[in-house]
């Protein structure tokens, strides 16, 4: 298994280099496949197939990818960080370096710049990056800010799904500015403005290297200054089970002491034991930057500092964000504050309250009813997504403790979240997408996995199977549909024997004829980011 030291490196720095130890011919083969995919995309501009050449169906078109994804070092790392029943989300992409610079950002919660909730510090999501060629600094490598996964910038009021460190970067066309020195200066200012004590670094690696990153690590695609092609395969993964506590205390060694309280909390969540963290003297003044706010919030949460409740109810986003994370380790105090927050007239405060309820995972009837009300009634899509994610996390935890945990209230909310009439596709995106229905499908997958592992009675799972069957056969969001299919497969393998034959029959009838390619309103190449 991945060593404790490697795990701490991931929790602290937000990334881990992996040698998959595949056959020596695989990197070259995957490089050629990537080049062919981009050539095919260029020939099919204007058709959805242009997108499909690069995204979401890669393992079917390129079977050799299974050699990478099933490689023991890759599986071992994913298992240690995300648990044994991790799920490869139905989104993947082949990126190509070009002449443009991206701004620093965290990826959107869902594919194609779709926002869908709040970011958990816990390792519930991860990205696997693979470089099939030697990648040098002049080839446009991915740049990252190590340790940035726990810190963020304000985003409320901005529709774009990515959290951009420089909100004006795209509007000011910095990435295409012919004056390269001005680009570099703006990028350097962005990093310094985000945190004066940190810096960015390029991922320069030998051919065949995989990089496992925390989903929320700040990164960007940089321009290339050579004629050599640089491709990167990207895969999304998510956790579907609660951590199995080993009872072993993990020793910490963080490169930045400001991250120690949060890294210690992540290590405790994974192992069950809290590592010792050196006491740092509390500053006399209020925290002036994100890193200090997060550090102090975790310390205050562990101490049960009631002032975090007032901070959670603040309309100042950065103040509220830090309090929200600090309250995840505050137990009952956090739950009381979260319930208050869900009653707010401010959408950001309601969203923070819903998120916090999911992280704390108390299964009280009042908590379930409150989240169900947000799913059914809240006017803000982000709040509904967050409430659905929270319900999935609560059920996942509670079922791990009690196989007979009452699911009816949660199932009622997920039935609402899966309803295409109530939650139609979001307009204006590259493919049909609904963040609410994606959130619903992920919650269902978490619940199904936990219920199977717990040995929950079949009658309790049956309504979930019904929702999954409907989503798997008729949902227009490919990511919700793919996640639902995974849930049904797990049900079938978990002895829910009536599920699989019915699903096969329904899918066979639905896809007896291949649908025609759908034309796009605008060229696909304008929508594709090059990380």
Language-model features: where?
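Structural detector for internal amphipathic alpha-helices that build alpha-solenoid repeat scaffolds
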Residues: 279-301, 318-333, 350-363, 373, ...
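Non-heme Fe(II)-dependent double-stranded beta-helix
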Residues: 1-119
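A short secondary-structure junction signal
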Residues: 104-107, 113-115, 138-144, 153-157, ...
């Amino acid at each position: 298994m991945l060593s404790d030291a490697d795990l701490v490196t991931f929790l602290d720095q937000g990334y881990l280099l992996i040698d998959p130890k595949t056959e020596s011919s695989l990197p070259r083969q995957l490089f050629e496949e990537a080049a062919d995919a981009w050539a095919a995309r260029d020939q099919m501009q204007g058709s959805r197939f242009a997108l499909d050449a690069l995204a979401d169906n890669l393992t079917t078109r390129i079977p050799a990818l299974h050699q990478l994804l099933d490689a023991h070092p890759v599986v071992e790392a994913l298992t240690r960080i995300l648990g044994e029943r991790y799920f490869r989300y139905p989104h993947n992409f082949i990126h190509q370096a070009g002449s443009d610079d991206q701004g620093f950002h965290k990826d959107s919660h869902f594919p194609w710049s779709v926002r869908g909730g709040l970011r958990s510090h816990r390792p519930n999501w991860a990205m696997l990056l693979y470089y099939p060629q030697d990648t040098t600094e002049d080839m446009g490598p991915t740049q990252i800010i190590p340790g940035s996964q726990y810190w963020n910038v304000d985003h409320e009021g901005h529709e774009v799904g990515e959290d951009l460190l420089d909100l004006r970067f795209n509007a000011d066309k910095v990435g295409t500015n012919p004056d390269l020195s001005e680009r570099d200066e703006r990028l350097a200012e962005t990093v310094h403005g985000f945190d004066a004590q940190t810096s960015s670094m390029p991922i320069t690696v030998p051919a065949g290297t995989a990089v496992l990153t925390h989903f929320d690590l700040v990164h960007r695609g940089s321009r290339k200054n050579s004629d050599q092609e640089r491709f990167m395969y990207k895969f999304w993964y998510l956790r579907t089970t609660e951590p199995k506590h080993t009872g072993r205390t993990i020793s910490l060694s963080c490169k930045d002491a400001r991250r120690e309280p949060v890294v210690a909390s992540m290590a405790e969540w994974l192992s069950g034991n809290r590592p010792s963290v050196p006491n740092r003297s509390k500053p006399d003044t209020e925290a002036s930057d994100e890193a200090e706010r997060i550090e102090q919030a975790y310390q205050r949460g562990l101490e049960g500092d009631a002032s975090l409740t007032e901070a959670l109810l603040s309309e100042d986003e950065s103040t509220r964000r830090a309090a929200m994370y600090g309250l995840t380790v505050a137990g009952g105090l956090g739950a009381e504050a979260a319930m208050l927050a869900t009653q707010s007239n401010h959408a950001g405060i309601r969203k923070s309250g819903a998120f916090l309820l999911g992280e704390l995972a108390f299964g009280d009837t009042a908590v379930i009813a409150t989240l169900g009300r947000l799913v059914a009634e809240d006017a803000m899509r982000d709040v509904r997504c967050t409430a659905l994610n929270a319900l999935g996390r609560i059920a996942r935890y509670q079922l791990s403790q009690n196989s007979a945990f009452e699911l009816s209230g949660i199932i009622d909310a997920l039935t609402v979240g899966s309803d295409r009439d109530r939650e139609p596709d979001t307009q204006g995106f590259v493919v049909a997408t609904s963040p609410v229905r994606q959130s619903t499908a992920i919650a269902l997958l978490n619940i199904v996995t936990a219920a199977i592992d717990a040995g929950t009675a079949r009658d309790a799972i049956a309504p979930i199977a019904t929702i999954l069957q409907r989503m798997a056969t008729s949902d227009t969001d490919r990511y919700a549909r793919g996640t639902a299919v995974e849930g049904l497969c797990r049900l079938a393998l978990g002895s829910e024997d009536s599920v699989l034959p019915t699903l096969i029959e329904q899918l066979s009838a639905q896809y007896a004829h291949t649908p025609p390619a759908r034309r796009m309103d605008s060229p696909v190449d304008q929508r594709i980011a090059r990380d």
